[in-house]
């Protein structure tokens, strides 16, 4: 398995270094649900501003305040403790009376708005996230400027970030240990983290191998293509390749890579053979996913940051603003710009 730091760069390895997240205010994330609350229903959606609190901690505190079980509070995604984040939490509170959320007091946390909603907010049920990042101590402004323009036009590899694998790769190591034993994992969080790490590592490996090809973004027979911004895909046939290539070049369609697991991967013929060969050596992780019946899926190979803009505060400090679809990693964008000083595996997704 290729180490995360050695995965193929789309625009070559950055020439300079820089510091990501010198303080929480350097990493601002605002969730974009993609819908507005219904205004009625047994659930309450709350938009919360937090700094110095992780998502699970806030959810547990909210459950205690409402005198409900912790499982009755849900969220669309984990947000980092050491960042300034706006995210939505959902609490199941049947009844017409709205709780007085002005009485909810938690250091570093503020309820910005709330409304009733008919459905539970489930993990992954958001459109995307808007990011404002500040990179400091940049050693090569010219290289970063060139890379920003290249990323705006050509995107970055849609790798799962280092944080998916845990500090020091602990989640991936846990998956490997589990795969080599028959012992059940009863801790649901560990089980989820380890399976996600296993599948993410295999995806990264497939993308890494494809990006090594000069014609990596050339549609091949059997590729699984995705409409930009959509989750479903269809299979390319040899007769359609010229037209499909035009649509890929115009970013209307995205070439996807496999999230391996049980069931069909989605690709066929030449594309399927390539993906299978790319991870042929990773039999342990593949066997784990099959054993645990993790369903195979697809994910876009490239990531195009939307609304990307930047502002140089001085020659060594730049502020970035961009929007990413749910499930994508801001750190994968930063990876294409600078060699980051320090380990950012602790940054939540």
UniProtKB/Swiss-Prot annotation:
InterPro entries, A to Z: PsdUridine_synth_cat_dom_sf (IPR020103), PsdUridine_synth_TruD (IPR001656), PsdUridine_synth_TruD_CS (IPR020119), PsdUridine_synth_TruD_insert (IPR011760), TruD_catalytic (IPR042214), TruD_insert_sf (IPR043165), TruD_pseudoU_synthase (IPR050170)
Protein keywords: Isomerase, tRNA processing
Enzyme class: isomerase
GO biological process annotation, one example: tRNA pseudouridine synthesis
Gene Ontology terms, MF aspect: RNA binding; tRNA pseudouridine(13) synthase activity
Keyword tRNA processing belongs to the record: yes
Active site: 80
Gene Ontology CC terms, in alphabetical order: cytosol
Domain (TRUD) ranges: 155-303
Residues at which substrate binds: 27, 129, 329
E.C. designation(s): 5.4.99.27
Catalytic activity of the protein: uridine(13) in tRNA = pseudouridine(13) in tRNA
Isomerase listed as a keyword: yes
CDD domains: PseudoU_synth_EcTruD
PANTHER family found in the cross-reference section: TRNA PSEUDOURIDINE SYNTHASE D (PTHR47811:SF1)
HAMAP family cross-referenced by the UniProt entry: TruD (MF_01082)
Function recorded in the entry: Responsible for synthesis of pseudouridine from uracil-13 in transfer RNAs.
Protein family per UniProt: Belongs to the pseudouridine synthase TruD family.
NCBIfam families per record: PRK00984.1-4, tRNA_TruD_broad
Protein name according to UniProt: tRNA pseudouridine synthase D
Organism this protein belongs to: Salmonella choleraesuis (strain SC-B67)
